[in-house]
């Protein structure tokens, strides 16, 4: 019976050990394991949220970069249009100024030509009168001379 009492004593000691472990050791171990499981789950969820946030941030950055490029392209196109408009305006203004200068120069040339013709007509008339006086060798009075010059100028 000795063996039976030993087994019974060991069984009682084992039951006491299991009860002690169930009461004092098992709850802190389970709490630590559950806490660690929760931390791991929270870490995984946080990593997933961070990945989603990163994807959203990358998509947003890509959209903003595309928008910035589009805006830059629009600004460049507007600048090119403005440059072309300024060049066209400058060309038109230069053309108008050239036409104005050419018109003024032409008017001055025409006026100078007219003045030179009048001067030449007067000189030709004076030479004709002087030649006529010498040929006729007589003196023509001033009124007749003026009348002859006027007729000669009108004919020229």
From Swiss-Prot:
GO terms for molecular function: proton-transporting ATP synthase activity, rotational mechanism; proton-transporting ATPase activity, rotational mechanism. It is a single-pass membrane protein. It is found in: Cell inner membrane. This is ATP synthase subunit b. Gene3D superfamilies: F1F0 ATP synthase subunit B, membrane domain. Keywords: ATP synthesis, Cell inner membrane, Cell membrane, CF(0), Hydrogen ion transport, Ion transport, Membrane, Transmembrane, Transmembrane helix, Transport. One of its GO terms (cellular component) is plasma membrane. F(1)F(0) ATP synthase produces ATP from ADP in the presence of a proton or sodium gradient. F-type ATPases consist of two structural domains, F(1) containing the extramembraneous catalytic core and F(0) containing the membrane proton channel, linked together by a central stalk and a peripheral stalk. During catalysis, ATP synthesis in the catalytic domain of F(1) is coupled via a rotary mechanism of the central stalk subunits to proton translocation. Component of the F(0) channel, it forms part of the peripheral stalk, linking F(1) to F(0). F-type ATPases have 2 components, F(1) - the catalytic core - and F(0) - the membrane proton channel. F(1) has five subunits: alpha(3), beta(3), gamma(1), delta(1), epsilon(1). F(0) has three main subunits: a(1), b(2) and c(10-14). The alpha and beta chains form an alternating ring which encloses part of the gamma chain. F(1) is attached to F(0) by a central stalk formed by the gamma and epsilon chains, while a peripheral stalk is formed by the delta and b chains. Belongs to the ATPase B chain family. The lineage of its organism: Bacteria, Pseudomonadati, Pseudomonadota, Gammaproteobacteria, Enterobacterales. SUPFAM superfamilies: F1F0 ATP synthase subunit B, membrane domain (SSF81573). HAMAP family: ATP_synth_b_bprime (MF_01398). The chain crosses the membrane at residues 11-31. Its main location: membrane. Coiled coil: none annotated. InterPro entries: ATP_synth_B-like_membr_sf, ATP_synth_b/b'su_bac/chlpt, ATP_synth_F0_bsu_bac, ATP_synthase_B_chain.
């Amino acid at each position: 019976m000795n063996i039976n009492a030993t087994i019974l004593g060991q069984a009682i000691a084992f039951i006491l050990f299991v009860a002690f472990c169930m009461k004092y050791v098992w709850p802190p171990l389970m709490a630590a394991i559950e806490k660690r499981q929760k931390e791991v789950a929270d870490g995984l969820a946080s990593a997933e949220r961070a990945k989603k946030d990163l994807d959203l941030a990358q998509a947003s950055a890509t959209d903003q970069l595309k928008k910035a490029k589009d805006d830059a392209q629009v600004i460049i196109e507007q600048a090119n249009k403005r440059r072309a408009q300024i060049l066209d305006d400058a060309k038109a203004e230069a053309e108008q100024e050239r036409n104005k200068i050419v018109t003024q120069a032409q008017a001055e040339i025409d006026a100078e030509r007219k003045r030179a013709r009048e001067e030449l007509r007067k000189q030709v008339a004076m030479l004709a009168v002087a030649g006529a006086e010498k040929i006729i060798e007589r003196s023509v009075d001033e009124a007749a001379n003026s009348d002859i010059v006027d007729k000669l100028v009108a004919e020229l």
